[in-house]
């Protein structure tokens, strides 16, 4: 059996076959890849050709918005996307996404230190509340009352190493290199996939398609997480 990079990050160093292993990073499918799967050739051509910030004509804006809403519902996880593309039926999407979340949580139990499992779950399930609030940074008190950074930093590191979540540190000034100006005490944490965030928040498809005032404000969290997801693909460097 193989070990996850997240396990290795918290385990003791061991031998490694240098030069004999190729690493392949696989991320959720992007919005553009969904348009390709849906054969939206006109929309793809427009996006590929657009290089300015001028307003988008309604002929493209409206279908792009509708497709983006669809992407928020389906996300980029391959099984969910394949089911939608092949069957055009949203009824089974939430079940697929929930199964992925349950698989993640079972994988959390394989953490080298069993005592870290509850902490992994607390951080994981705090994502919706972290992103729904007007927070400038990740708040440990939203993970668990009385939680402190030093108690949860190993668990958070595991989730980041496993690429289940993405951690984005704040920079103290916009200067290069950005890594030299990281504020280690201030960062935000995002889900790897926007639709997994929706299911983690227990928002079903009908609630999203027909929103009430109760869930309208949470759409900002979806947009923020989607932008992070898109930037992660566009820039093959740690985001800040």
PLM segments and residue spans:
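Generic hydrophobic-segment detector
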Residues: 9, 65-66, 183, 210
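Accessory nucleic acid-recognition modules appended to NTPase machines
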Residues: 82-240
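Conserved protein kinase catalytic core
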Residues: 9-10, 199
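Interdomain motor-coupling "hinge/lid" segment immediately C-terminal to the ATP-binding subdomain
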Residues: 4, 10-132
């Amino acid at each position: 059996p193989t070990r996850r990079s997240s396990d290795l990050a918290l385990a003791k160093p061991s031998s490694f076959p240098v030069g004999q292993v190729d690493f392949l990073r696989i991320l959720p499918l992007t919005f553009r890849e969904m348009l390709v799967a849906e054969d939206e050739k006109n929309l793809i051509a427009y996006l590929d050709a657009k290089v300015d910030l001028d307003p988008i004509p309604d002929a493209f804006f409206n279908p792009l918005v509708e497709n983006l809403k669809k992407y928020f519902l389906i996300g980029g996880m391959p099984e969910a996307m394949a089911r939608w593309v092949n069957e055009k039926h949203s009824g089974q999407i939430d079940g697929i996404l929930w199964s992925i979340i349950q698989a993640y949580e079972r994988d959390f139990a394989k953490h080298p230190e069993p005592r870290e499992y509850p902490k992994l779950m607390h951080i994981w399930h705090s994502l919706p509340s972290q992103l729904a609030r007007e927070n400038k940074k990740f708040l440990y008190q939203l993970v668990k009352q009385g939680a402190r950074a030093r108690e949860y930093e190993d668990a958070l590191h595991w989730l980041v190493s496993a690429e289940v979540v993405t951690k984005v540190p704040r920079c103290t000034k916009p200067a290069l290199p950005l890594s030299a100006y990281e504020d280690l005490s201030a960062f935000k944490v995002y889900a790897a996939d926007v639709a997994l965030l929706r299911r983690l928040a227990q928002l079903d498809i009908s609630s999203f398609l027909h929103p009430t005032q109760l869930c309208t404000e949470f759409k900002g969290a979806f947009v923020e997480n989607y932008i992070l997801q898109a930037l992660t693909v566009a820039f093959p460097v740690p985001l800040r």
